[in-house]
Amino acid sequence: MAGKDVEEEEPWLFEYKGTVFPGCTRKENLDAMPDFHIRDDDVIVVGFPKAGNHWCAEIINNVMRAAGKTTEATMDPEAPGRILEFDDEIADETRTNHRFLEGKPSPRLICTHLHREFAPPGVASPTGNTKIISIMRNPKDTAVSYYHFSTKLGDNEDDWGTFADNFLQGRWEYGDFYRHVLGWWELRDDPHFLFLKYEDMKKDMKGAVEKVATFLEAELEEAQVASIVETCTFRNLKVVYDKSADIGCRSIIARKGIAGDWKSMFTDEQNAAFDAKYEENLEGTGLKFDFE
């Protein structure tokens, strides 16, 4: 896509204020974000695509149900347990997604891949009691996972080498990885935020569930924590997702769910290029990733 108009080169993509977006995001939703109202009891998950957003949201859903923060009465009757998103199209063609979200019952669990600069003010600079969980994953595994996902979805027709270069240069969906993670990382000391890393969750799932529960002020028994850990293992969620007939791409969300899968795809040259970009962008920021 280098040197060419993104919409001419990849017709399912479009550029908005210098960032590449998939067509399903829709410009109307992005235009509406500065005025979108965030409620005090909203729980928001922010993360670059393929960072573990859905996995994190499943944990949150289960924690909130176990703590009695969501009940049958507060579940969305149109899609109980569904993960709502700012930046994705919905089946109802009569409403853009921000209008759809405005009518959803509280508490809402909303996921977004948006950079901080594109997010609603109530997420980018939160006040009140809104809870925001930022999920991050190392850029190499993120790129490999995104390649396989977008290829299965039919959005990507490039080979791995071309895709890896586009990802590294921020010429793929949602733009530059580092611009995204560092924008949210600036808020690491804000009490409205909890930051989680995919690799840490893989190493200590129980600890991740307990962190989420504490952050959401959800008092859980040990047995409830153990049940959530078992329910939200990659193995169990993959079975659910693979059989899903849900809207969109849920059935291809889960693939391997491991850390270090980048080694199966990266050439030495690609590895060196990704390492150089990593050091250039993260040196001195305090943000580090594990690659194993």
Where are these regions (language model features)?
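An amphipathic alpha-helix signature
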Residues: 140-143, 206-213, 222-225, 271, ...
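PAPS-dependent sulfotransferase catalytic domain
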Residues: 1-196, 242-260, 264-292
